[in-house]
Amino acid sequence: LLTVHRKLKPTGAERVVWGDADRHYFPVAQTPWGPMASLICWESYMPLARVALYEKGIPLYLSPNTNDNEEWQATIRHIAIEGHCFFVNCDMVFTRDMYPAGLHCPEEIGRLPDIVCRGGSCVVDPYGHYVTQPVWDREAIICADLDLTQVPRSRMEFDGCGHYARPDVLKLTVDDR
């Protein structure tokens, strides 16, 4: 276990059970491949959270989630380009028969499609190209050889937190005391 991450802001019905994470749950893990960080599910829609990770120079961005649609695929490709990092999308596959027997809402479960969450796990490079294509409608372990030299090469072109930044005009402050 490299680190622990709590979701910064629970989404929708998650708020009934969980509260906001505090600033100590915004970790970046040091690995032999460079800093690695994660935002969970819709945290990746939080621009300031993404920039906080980009400013730490992450070459690897991991996102466990349940977004199984083409719009999410467009989002992760954008994030990979924006952050000039590899985006590892860990999307679950969930079928109706995976619900435990005896839940209090069998009629609602019965109306669900056979495949509730289609997956879509994949890896995207810093230029927004798929290293592995999304895997739909089945469980799979995806493997990819990543050319980490793509990260600094892509940042030579555009580095929103480096040579292309304007800290005299725009600044992000992260309270991680």
Q: Predicted regions: what is each one?
A:
Residues 28-30, 79, 113, 133-134:
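Short secondary-structure boundary/capping segments
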Residues 92-177:
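C-terminal beta-strand edge segments of enzyme domains
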Residues 1-59, 65, 69-78, 157:
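Active-site catalytic loop in hydrolytic enzyme cores
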Residues 60, 86:
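Short, Asp-centered acidic motifs that coordinate Mg2+ and/or phosphate
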Residues 8, 13-15, 26, 39, ...:
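Generic secondary-structure boundary/loop-capping signal
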Residues 3-4, 87-90:
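General beta-strand structural signal in soluble alpha/beta enzymes
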Residues 63-64, 90:
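Generic beta-sheet signal
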